[in-house]
From Swiss-Prot:
The protein's Enzyme Commission number: 6.1.1.10
Primary role: Is required not only for elongation of protein synthesis but also for the initiation of all mRNA translation through initiator tRNA(fMet) aminoacylation.
Binding, Zn(2+): C143, C146, C156, C159
UniProt keyword Ligase, yes or no: yes
Known cofactor(s): Zn(2+)
UniProt-listed Pfam families: Anticodon_3, tRNA-synt_1g
Gene from which the chain derives: metG
InterPro entries: Anticodon_Met, Met-tRNA_ligase_1, Met-tRNA_synth, Methionyl/Leucyl_tRNA_Synth, MetRS_core, MetRS_Zn, Rossmann-like_a/b/a_fold, tRNAsynth_Ia_anticodon-bd
Organism (species): Pyrobaculum calidifontis (strain DSM 21063 / JCM 11548 / VA1)
CDD domains according to UniProt: Anticodon_Ia_Met (cd07957), MetRS_core (cd00814)
Position of sequence motif 'KMSKS' region: 333-337
Protein name: Methionine--tRNA ligase
């Protein structure tokens, strides 16, 4: 049994996440954490709401509310939605917790004492109208690299490059649109230059990093790492702990990534095992894996390891950052302003959570940008989830229920065809295992579905309904092996569609606790089945048209409400 810390990128609670955010981090992390638990590993799965920083402060100013009120209300909304999506966090917290604030301040004090922090006076954009400095998202302009018109002062969300406000072309205040002035202010910087060789070694020698994470990180290293300001002039954040830094806060990205540690601290504190966290974050054998979209790669592959090294506290460096490409919606980027896409609160009013989980993992953008389309979603639900998976489960269990007394038959007299089918199912199951281990979640799901397809072909070829009349022992063998394959199917699908598999396992008579190893064990004859009902249903084209109409209505209703927490559909 290995120890794992699994972290999904902390959602910024300025708004509700959309489907792309979901598959890029939270859902992917949940699938992997559930798989690891099925394998019997010791897993701590954490995340939390990213509460601080300029976007929330800007939005709060524009709405006339306190940033803390805004952040806490949105945290409650997002936490509730993740529950409804069946996300199995061990702890979902937030960056304004006492534990996180104290941890971040002590962590940066140590970096300062180690000599990796220096001060520099420099000109920063200042809005004379609003009388505030304009860090990060307080300032927008054209990206100097890709030309994106609404790049932020810290990063371009279009090309992912880290930016400095002075690099923006035609900058303007995000609050009022005014042209900024440049005024002198003092900031505290992390000297990334002194850590560059160690970071390069970490990236180059890491065999687990996905291609996009490695390529983006090596490109940044090739350009040379530059010192990055760890303080900001905005008010809503964690007060900087450095001497003379009164009135400054820690830059949101530098403190949010430390949440992966502070959340584990908080988790064990809640369990009354306060020092237990060190067995995870200070044990070199612990596997630490983050799930993020590609725009978050620099902060997880460069910045966080740099912070851990600069702190010198014996922290284990992350094993990998499982980064996805972007999910598009009908060929275009999600856009709240253009009402383009589906947000996770809207989705649950259209289809059950397991349907969405299955669709998103089935099309997970692992190697290239992928587009969600309703046509493809319809095909996945109707042909894959219902016809391939649901139909096979129903065929096997309904036959045993109606023709074999509702109990798992004895192994009977297996023929070569039965042995061949079992071997094929086992090989697919082990192949799915390899994909899960490599965090290739889409390929893992596609492989698990093949077990059901193989099973449907097997039943058609062996025709147990005919064998039952003349060779009942062979019919027993067929249905025994088919039932065994359902155990593999259940284990393989459980990380993706947990609620449906729970129902499936109940129908199968709960032969044992569902684990990965249990799927490989021969079934015990005589297990009594539960009530057998179809697991899934088809979705018609007319129903999709109604869904799209309902989606538009939801978006109109949202737009009519002032506050984001009122807009969320709970």
């Amino acid at each position: 049994m290995a120890k794992y810390v699994i972290g999904s990128a902390w959602p910024y609670v300025q708004t509700v996440p959309h489907l792309g955010n979901m598959i890029g981090s939270v859902l992917s992390a949940d699938v992997y954490a559930r798989y690891l638990r099925l394998r019997g590993h010791d897993v701590v799965f954490v995340s939390g709401s990213d509460m601080h920083g300029t976007p929330i402060e800007v939005e709060a100013i524009q709405l006339g509310v306190d940033p803390a009120e805004y952040a806490f209300k949105m945290h409650g909304v997002v936490a509730e939605l993740f529950k409804r999506w069946n996300i199995s966090f061990d702890l979902y917290t937030h960056t304004h917790s006492e534990t996180h604030v104290a941890f971040v301040q002590e962590f940066f004090k140590r970096i300062y004492e180690n000599g990796y922090i220096f001060t520099k006076d420099e000109e920063m954009p200042y809005c004379p109208r609003d009388k505030i400095f304009l860090p990060d998202r307080f300032i927008i302009g054209k990206c100097p690299y890709c030309g994106y018109e609404r790049a932020r002062g810290d990063q371009c969300e279009n090309c992912g490059r880290l930016l400095d406000p002075k690099q923006l072309v035609e900058p303007r205040c995000a609050v009022c649109g005014s042209k900024p002035e440049w005024r002198l202010t003092r900031h505290w910087y992390l000297d990334l230059r002194r850590l560059e060789d160690k970071i390069r070694k970490y990236v180059e020698e890491n065999p687990h990093l996905p291609q996009n994470a490695k390529e983006m990180s090596l490109a940044m290293l090739k350009e040379g790492l530059k010192p990055r300001a760890v303080t900001r002039d905005n008010k809503w954040g964690i007060p900087a702990p450095f001497p003379g830094a009164e009135g400054k806060t820690i830059y949101v990205w530098f403190e949010a990534v430390l949440g992966y540690i502070s959340a584990v601290v908080e988790h064990f504190k809640r369990l009354g095992k306060e020092s237990e966290w060190e067995k995870y974050w200070r044990d070199p054998d612990t596997k630490i894996i983050f799930f993020v979209g590609k725009d978050n790669i620099p902060f997880h592959v460069i910045i966080l390891p740099a912070l851990l090294l600069a702190n010198g506290g014996g922290y284990t460096l992350p094993t990998t950052t499982a980064s996805t490409e972007y999910l598009l919606y009908e060929g275009d980027k999600f856009s709240k302003s253009r009402r383009w896409g589906i947000w996770i609160d809207e989705a649950l009013h259209l289809l059950p959570a397991d349907y969405w989980r299955f669709i998103l993992v089935y099309i997970r953008p692992e190697n290239r940008d992928t587009s969600f389309t309703w046509a493809q979603a319809l095909e996945i639900v109707n042909k894959v989830l219902n016809d391939d998976v649901g139909n096979y489960v129903n065929r096997v269990l309904s036959f045993i229920k109606s023709r074999m007394g509702g109990v798992v038959p004895p192994p009977g007299t297996p023929q070569e065809e039965d042995k061949s089918f079992l071997q094929a199912a086992l090989q697919l199951f082990k192949k799915a295992e390899r994909h899960y281990e490599a965090v290739e979640l889409k390929d893992a799901l596609h492989t698990v579905v093949e077990i059901a397809r193989e099973g449907n072909r097997y039943l058609n070829a062996r025709a147990p309904w005919d064998l039952l009349k003349t060779r009942p022992e062979e019919a027993n063998a067929v249905m025994y092996h088919a039932y065994w394959s359902l155990k593999m199917l259940a284990a393989g699908l459980a990380p993706v569609i947990p609620e449906s598999v729970e129902k499936m396992w109940e129908m199968m008579g709960r032969p044992a606790s569902l684990t990965w190893d249990e799927a490989l064990r021969e079934p015990a004859p005589g297990v009594k089945l539960g009530e057998v009902k179809p697991l899934f249903r088809k979705v018609g084209e007319d129903e999709v048209k109604k869904m799209l109409q309902a989606l538009e209505q939801m978006k109109r209703e949202k737009a009519s409400k002032k506050y984001p927490w009122e807009q969320a559909l709970l």
